[in-house]
């Protein structure tokens, strides 16, 4: 152990340097967000919990084309189409999404020709059981009704880039 090393050790040079760095950051504003009480703004392109949308007259948008089911890489979407109606259109009888399988890629939303299936703004949907992550048509429509205003605004903001 040399004299220089002994002097540095005795004067605690490294400790003093570390203390200066600590004090420098101590008085700066905190970059951390206090999460449950404060939330950062979400991008209009955010992909969260799925929702099925309705037209303003209350009719569901989904035309049972099954493009979302075909394009889903995780095979998380299951659709059963009902019989053709008098006007020649079809509607879904069953629309299920297995959120355990879903990878939130957004391909279902891009494939939909009528903007029926969208990924909404909600990212807080933790559950206690796996069964709660199997979304049926009623739950997806309820999500769409709950967030319709925000979803429509996000689609409008994203329209120039689509």
Swiss-Prot record:
Binds 2 [4Fe-4S] clusters per subunit. GO terms for cellular component: plasma membrane. GO terms for molecular function: 4 iron, 4 sulfur cluster binding; iron ion binding; NADH:ubiquinone reductase (non-electrogenic) activity; quinone binding. Its cofactor is [4Fe-4S] cluster. Residues 52-82, 93-122 form the 4Fe-4S ferredoxin-type domain. [4Fe-4S] cluster 2 binds at residues 72, 102, 105, 108. GO terms for biological process: aerobic respiration. It is found in: Cell inner membrane. It is a peripheral membrane protein. It is an enzyme of class 7 (translocase). It catalyses: a quinone + NADH + 5 H(+)(in) = a quinol + NAD(+) + 4 H(+)(out). [4Fe-4S] cluster 1 binds at residues 62, 65, 68, 112. Keywords: 4Fe-4S, Cell inner membrane, Cell membrane, Iron, Iron-sulfur, Membrane, Metal-binding, NAD, Quinone, Repeat, Translocase, Ubiquinone. Its main location: membrane. Belongs to the complex I 23 kDa subunit family. NDH-1 is composed of 14 different subunits. Subunits NuoA, H, J, K, L, M, N constitute the membrane sector of the complex. NDH-1 shuttles electrons from NADH, via FMN and iron-sulfur (Fe-S) centers, to quinones in the respiratory chain. The immediate electron acceptor for the enzyme in this species is believed to be ubiquinone. Couples the redox reaction to proton translocation (for every two electrons transferred, four hydrogen ions are translocated across the cytoplasmic membrane), and thus conserves the redox energy in a proton gradient. This is NADH-quinone oxidoreductase subunit I. It comes from Afipia carboxidovorans (strain ATCC 49405 / DSM 1227 / KCTC 32145 / OM5) (Oligotropha carboxidovorans). The lineage of its organism: Bacteria, Pseudomonadati, Pseudomonadota, Alphaproteobacteria, Hyphomicrobiales.
